[in-house]
Structure formats: C-alpha cells, structure tokens
Amino acid sequence: MSMQDPLADMLTRIRNAQMAEKSVVSMPSSTLKVAVAKVLKDEGYIAGYEVTGEAKPSLSIELKYFEGRPVIEELKRSSRPGLRQYKAVSELPKVRGGLGVSIVSTNKGVMTDRAARAAGVGGEVLCTVF
C-alpha cells in the first residue's frame, strides 16, 4: 500500500515516539522530510537528525526532552493532500501568539513563518509546532 501523505506520517511518528519516551525515531527519508527536520533542529525542537543509507535512505531524528517532558507539545499538519493551504505573506498564521512556529514551503525553500515574513514570501503552510 502506498503512503498518501509522507509528511503526516513523519509528524505522527515523532508524536508517537515522544509519547513512548523514545530517544530516536527512524523513518524513510525524502527531501521534504529532511528540510522540515532541519527547521525543527534550527528552532530547537529536536536535538538532531541524520540521513543514512544510499539505495533506501533513512532519516533518524534525535528527540529532545526538558525535565522529562517532550519539548514539542503540539505538532499538527496544516496543509494536506485533500486541502492544500496556501497563504500570502500577510496571511501567514502565528502559532499561539508567536510562541510556536509554522513551517512553510516557499519558492525559496522550507522555512519558518518568521523567516518567510522577513523574506517577504508566502507559500504552503505545512505544519504548526508548539
């Protein structure tokens, strides 16, 4: 059976691994997943990530905890295959008053909502993280 939404699968694997208090979660790799992992690392939501394997690359994400609780409290998919959400730069959502981040796919790459506003570009709102 083919996977319809690989990014939603990635987010679900991260949520499930954090509920089970795992230190590392592994999944099939793709360019989009690596870009989202890079944004999560840059924003301090995960400890690190690594791509391994040549023929079938695998993405391993090292999860981050603070005082025994996961750093990521909420991880939600916004745009999905059945209902894409494209937003102009002025319409980009602020997550919990700016405490969280939206991850946006723009023509200049995958970035946070803050970086997209600074660059003056809109795009597809992939997910929100808090």
UniProtKB/Swiss-Prot annotation:
Q: Which GO terms describe its cellular component?
A: ribonucleoprotein complex; ribosome
The record ties this protein, via InterPro entries, to: Ribosomal_uS8 (IPR000630), Ribosomal_uS8_CS (IPR047863), Ribosomal_uS8_sf (IPR035987)
A Gene Ontology molecular function term for this protein is: structural constituent of ribosome
Q: Which keywords fit this entry according to its UniProt record?
A: Ribonucleoprotein, Ribosomal protein, RNA-binding, rRNA-binding
Q: Where is the signal peptide?
A: none
A single Gene Ontology biological process assigned to it is: translation
**Oligomeric form and interacting partners:** Part of the 30S ribosomal subunit. Contacts proteins S5 and S12.
Tell me the HAMAP family matching this sequence. Ribosomal_uS8_B
> Family assignment?
Belongs to the universal ribosomal protein uS8 family.
Q: What does the record give as the function of this protein?
A: One of the primary rRNA binding proteins, it binds directly to 16S rRNA central domain where it helps coordinate assembly of the platform of the 30S subunit.
Q: What is this protein called?
A: Small ribosomal subunit protein uS8
Q: Which organism is it from?
A: Pseudomonas entomophila (strain L48)
